[in-house]
Amino acid sequence: ITYVSFSGSGPLVSLMLTEDFKEFTRIGPLVPPEDKDASLFPRRFKGRYALIHRPIIRGAADIWISFSPDLTHWGDHQVLLPTRPGWWDCHRVGLGAQPIETPEGWLIIYHGVRMTASGSIYRVGLALLDLEEPWRVQRRSDEWVLGPKPYEQFGDVPGVTFPTGAIFEEETGELRLYYGIADTMVGVAIADMDEVLSYLLSCPSPAEGESHG
């Protein structure tokens, strides 16, 4: 289980282990601060663990991927999903739910932030990674797929739609996304996984260039 802990230098990603969700063993920090919005992939790649996380480096808040043979020594750090100047996710991005394995690739659900004169707006976007080489981004949504509705504009932090976890029911094909509303409530959004993947596959790959849509 990855989680955010705190230090004198800022938040950082830490790890705990469990076999039954009754007893937990704290392993401690995985990466140095400032870092958060992290998740391990549910399987290894060529013997290596893979971690998606969001460090803050010289003010930049991009999504990175890193690899480790033992959950202790991390390297091969790469920017996975950068912010996009002028877009809805231009100022900050971060992982939301855990990576979900699908026949088309790893489904990534992330939050993107645009700062405006009236405050920040947090919305939800999607990406698709290669199944065996998850550092390769196959598709990325042009537009956000979930944003604050009028009734979600009020709370401790207005204008926030923050994805935190997801469940995919293979039998029904239903994807349930749980998300924070204005840092005050928890909501759930339901979609058909086939429709989600069909939309993503209609988006251009980053290598093909991106437009504002």
How would you label these PLM feature ranges?
Residues 1-91, 100-159, 170-213:
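Beta-rich carbohydrate-recognition and catalytic domains
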Residues 166-168:
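Conserved interaction-surface patches within small, structured recognition/assembly domains
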